[in-house]
Amino acid sequence: MPKLKTRKAAAKRFRATGTGKIVRRKAGKSHLLEHKSSDKKRSMSKTTLVHERDELNVRLMLPYL
């Protein structure tokens, strides 16, 4: 059986934790930041877990994660 290919776009966006959960960065912190509050920008800097309903799709895109 041939090797499974990894979706490179997904590989750049998702990482696995030590316990196997998938983490992602929050969107909206690359530009147009001037009108956003400091609290908003600080909360967007943190990583968050991928929702359980999206986790299967991410795992299919990253077979070796």
Swiss-Prot record:
Keywords, ordered alphabetically: Ribonucleoprotein, Ribosomal protein
GO cellular component: cytosolic large ribosomal subunit
Keyword Ribosomal protein attached: yes
Compositionally biased region (Basic and acidic residues): 31-42
Protein name: Large ribosomal subunit protein bL35
SUPFAM superfamilies: L35p-like
Name of a matching Pfam family: Ribosomal_L35p
Family named by the database record: Belongs to the bacterial ribosomal protein bL35 family.
One GO BP annotation of this record: translation
InterPro entries: Ribosomal_bL35, Ribosomal_bL35-like, Ribosomal_bL35_CS, Ribosomal_bL35_sf
GO molecular-function terms, A-Z: structural constituent of ribosome
Residue ranges, annotated region (Disordered): 24-48
Phylogenetic classification of the source organism: Bacteria, Bacillati, Cyanobacteriota, Cyanophyceae, Nostocales
